[in-house]
């Protein structure tokens, strides 16, 4: 079940990334079949039961890099290096540098895609961690009542990260609805911890009896 859930999250993240990639200047520099990897990698990940791995998340970040690339020092370094190579060896790389500048600088895109796939990855990791904890407890002979309710606070915890991330990373307006969502997320998280601890506690009491 957890593998299929993470596969679904991975494919959603892949679709979001595909939409942002095809609207970005990065598509001019990457040949066509490459973006199909966004949908193929999670399917390959099924073989190791981790369709939404960190490696796949890294691929998603690469395809979502356009909004932040032009404003980075790395991008400026690439442009300067290409110009320097052309000046020294007359390789014509300054034309490539100019093409990159025209394509990326001034291109208006948002980081919504980057934020969305990051949240989906965190959500997948939180679900995976909860599933492994439940599985480990059951392997040790501990039956946890209402174990799957733990996934609900896990979802709200990941949602809390989603709402807090833009507030921490930028100076956008932090509306009341986000504060309410954050409070609910924190409450749900601690409720999940409480349910889990109570289940383990009750099992220990029953085992001791």
From Swiss-Prot:
**Source organism lineage?**
Archaea, Methanobacteriati, Methanobacteriota, Archaeoglobi, Archaeoglobales
Q: Which UniProt keywords apply?
A: Cell membrane, Membrane, Transmembrane, Transmembrane helix
Transmembrane stretches in the record are 26-48, 147-169, 179-196
Q: Its topology with respect to the membrane?
A: Multi-pass membrane protein
The entry's localization annotation reads: Cell membrane
Q: Which named protein is this?
A: Uncharacterized protein AF_2423
Where is it found, in Gene Ontology cellular component terms? plasma membrane
UniProt entry tagged with the keyword Transmembrane? yes
Q: Which organism is it from?
A: Archaeoglobus fulgidus (strain ATCC 49558 / DSM 4304 / JCM 9628 / NBRC 100126 / VC-16)
